Amino acid sequence: MLRHFKYQQTMKILILNGANLNLQGKRDRGVYGCESFDEFIPRLQQKYADLTIDYCQTNIEGEIVTALHQAEGKYDGVLLNAGGYTHTSVVIRDAIAAIDTPVVEIHISNIAAREDFRHTTLIGSVAIGSIVGFGLNSYILGVEALKLHLQ
């Protein structure tokens, strides 16, 4: 009798944060909340101990592009909060479009309920979806979205 074994690899997710997100917990607390990523990421990794969740933050647009390129083949999915680059960066949009790795657009605040210039997202049209407005819980919802997408 033949036995079939399903090889199950641990899902790997990259959380990639852009400009000013190094100030999370300090900047505009009324909009973004008080918890820093130094506090949140270990809590997220503990909640999803069955997954590998790596974290990267940069204020430099080109480094976001490079991280997206390097995610190809290394990660099963990316949660991307590009910060203000969401509204302006054609090169980040093009980097997402150029890779096969699924990307979920994440925003801590509800960008549709903020200033007019924040309503436009260049990234949303090439991401598999967008999760906005749930505070840091947007990242938890993003992990769940990637898990469902990759099933």
Question: What spans do the regions from the language model cover?
Answer:
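Extreme N-terminal starter segment of soluble prokaryotic enzymes
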Residues: T10-L14
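Glycine- and acidic-residue-enriched helix-capping/strand-helix junction motifs
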Residues: L23-D38
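Short acidic active-site motifs
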Residues: E63-A67
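Short, glycine-/small-residue-rich phosphate/pyrophosphate-handling segment
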Residues: D54-Y55, V104, A113-Q151
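Short acidic/histidine-rich motifs immediately flanking catalytic phosphotransfer sites
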Residues: A71-V78
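Short glycine-rich anion-binding loops that position phosphate/pyrophosphate groups of nucleotides
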Residues: A19-L21, G83-T86, S109-I111
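Short Gly/Thr/Asp-enriched flexible loops that form oxyanion-binding sites at enzyme active sites
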Residues: S89-D100
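Short beta->alpha junction loops
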Residues: D54-G62
